[in-house]
Amino acid sequence: MPADKRVSSIDLLRGVVMVIMALDHVRDFFHADAFHHAPDDLDHVSAATFLTRWITHYCAPVFVFLAGTSAWFVHRRRTTTQLSSFLVKRGIWLVFVEAVIISFLWTFNPTLPAIFLGVIWAIGISMIALAGLVHLPARGILLFGLVLVLGHNALDDLHPAGLWWGILHEQVFRMVDGRLIGFIYPLIPWIGVMALGYVFGGLYAPERDPAQRRRLLRLLGMASIALFLVLRLTDVYGDPRPWEPGRGPAFAFLSVLNATKYPPSLHYLLMTLGPAFLFLSVAEARPGPWARRLIVFGRVPFFYYVMHLVVIHAFAILAVVLLGRPWTDMVLDTFVIREPHLQDYGFSLPVVYGVWVAVVVLLYPACRWFAQLKRERTDWWWLSYL
């Protein structure tokens, strides 16, 4: 496998989760229930609403994990020092983009004194941490990642005062110098996920037998799912929110799936990464036409992420105008689902799915163009940061 050759199965998986991610963000801007109830509130939302949210849980873990895997591929054509420098610079760039550009795209309000630090922030900080970890042996990085992912739920009952603990292990919103900052993605487990993703890249080394890799992927996937089921059903460890039996089989089933995302519990990570490994084990065949389209999205994830927020928010402005409301209703003073003047706004779930399809279809030509540009202009060094 040449050093510059992309692995289509990884791009395909990334493309799948990028497309699914757009569904969750369309739901934020369009679903009537989103303005009244959390989608994981099983006492108030329908099974369809819960499952619409649940399927998007696969996005962040796979996104962060494969960012670590991508760093391993970069390491194959750069020295460790060069990789470390690249990760620091890209990490700082991603934090800047999250704080300045993406926070604005969520609100379209340039004067709002608020910053929302989500998955791009978590990836950026995790890359900076990985920049130091790559100087360790692979076993050391693996051990570090496992300790964070497997062990961080032992910290669930710790709630020390101060902002730093919130940043590391508890979702927190704080006023800092007159500006609201939402630390939405606590860092400790995500740093571990990226570290494991980096070590995982070794499965795609040129000397690795593809059949052996597929067997290992199947084993990883089945073991992760089995461990999830054992831990979840026994509730001995791994998630601060236990499932609830005794309210009927349908409720119990959804309750088992309702693992904690902020911070991502061990149950949550096993539930999402296990199927991802199984997907990779069967995704190495020659891609068909639909898979090739998804691969396009997977090759330009950062571009897709930024542009999908632009398109979704623009569609939301169009929606309020068509409803006879002022377009400024979508110039927000807080996160969209908490906006007081939108409590009487929103659409049914089928409309949400229709808008989602329209967003993805509209993004495809732009992503195909940008993917082609990145292939052709390898002399533009700055494209590696996009």
Give, region by region, the residue ranges found by the protein language model:
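Alpha-helical transmembrane segments and their immediate juxtamembrane cytosolic regions
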Residues: 1-386
